[in-house]
């Protein structure tokens, strides 16, 4: 038998070997927890398509935030559920200074000043038609007119105390417009997390159920502004545009089916790159684990580690609390 000079298995034999040479690790500080918020008091509503996730009134949000802080998770992302009577074609409620998001931000920053609060800048929770922008008589989403509303929305979030505003709408030029407005208004330290590469994906269904936009959207889609799932080079162009317009971080959405995009963006630009482990991905893992087809803990932690390996600096995931507990207990 010939002598083997290289035996890669030597570094896999024992746990200390594997731990010492592990290239990527996962910690609670890598995770961002998305939270759905609703009007009312002492209210928690289950979401059928997202087992374990609830819509929370602001008082319950503060209870949740205490747990999040104790788990060493450093950031939350807020997504509002707006009542139908407040939804309009012009999405005026999106920039109401006393709106649900704005009040939630103020409450969080008063009670947990060191917890980073990320707000979603998009109009779909606020429009009667469920699109992310204003529409013309043919239902086509109007770009520049929508950007004008997004600026107002982002400013209202910054005024409330949001640490990071996150435009997820995919309108052209909105990052530069929002950055200019923030600078001119004195919000020079407000971060912009751009959903720079957001695909027209089938994985968003449970999210739309959660925020109540699926019924408004009906049989329409968002393919005229969200990206085609078949495109990779386009993602690089979109990210480059947003970086040049003033984005501090960029988001790839969805996550797991688009790890190639996460990797390409990180390798190409070297900027803070986040990934969104979206509602459909969460629902699939939850459903499989509830049927005992997979082990939830090991599968989720492996999935999140894969995001890190691909180059993600942070992961927005509905498993954040569970993962943080598992990491803490390991």
Region annotations inferred by a language model:
Residues 2-6, 26-32, 38-330:
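Alpha/beta enzyme core
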């Amino acid at each position: 038998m010939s002598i083997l000079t290289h035996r890669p298995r030597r570094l896999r034999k024992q746990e200390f070997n594997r731990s010492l040479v592990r290239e990527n690790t996962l910690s609670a500080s890598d995770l961002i927890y998305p939270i759905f918020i609703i009007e009312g008091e002492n209210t928690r509503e289950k979401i059928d398509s997202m087992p374990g996730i609830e819509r929370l009134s602001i008082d319950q949000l503060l209870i949740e935030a205490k747990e999040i802080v104790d788990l060493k998770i450093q950031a939350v992302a807020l997504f509002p559920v707006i009542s139908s009577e407040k939804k309009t074609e012009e999405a005026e409620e999106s920039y109401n200074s006393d709106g649900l998001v704005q009040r939630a931000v103020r409450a969080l920053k008063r009670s947990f000043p060191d917890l980073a609060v990320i707000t979603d800048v998009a109009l779909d929770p606020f429009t009667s038609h469920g699109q992310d922008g204003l529409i013309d008589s043919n239902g086509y989403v109007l770009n520049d007119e929508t950007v004008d509303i997004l600026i107002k929305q982002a400013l209202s979030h910054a005024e409330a105390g949001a640490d990071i505003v996150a435009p997820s709408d995919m309108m052209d030029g909105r990052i530069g417009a929002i950055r200019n407005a923030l600078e001119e208004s004195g919000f020079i330290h407000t971060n912009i997390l751009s959903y720079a590469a957001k695909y027209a994906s089938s994985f968003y269904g449970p999210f739309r159920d959660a925020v109540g936009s699926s019924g408004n959207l009906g049989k329409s889609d968002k393919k005229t502004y969200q990206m085609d799932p078949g495109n990779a080079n386009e993602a690089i162009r979109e990210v480059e545009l947003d970086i040049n317009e003033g984005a501090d971080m960029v988001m790839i959405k969805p996550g797991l089916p688009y790890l190639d995009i996460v990797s390409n963006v990180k390798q190409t630009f070297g900027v803070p790159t986040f990934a969104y482990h979206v509602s459909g991905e969460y629902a699939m893992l939850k459903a499989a684990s509830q049927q005992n087809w997979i082990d939830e803990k090991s599968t989720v932690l492996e999935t999140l580690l894969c995001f890190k390996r691909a180059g993600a600096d942070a992961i927005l995931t509905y498993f954040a609390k569970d993962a943080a507990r598992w990491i803490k207990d390991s």
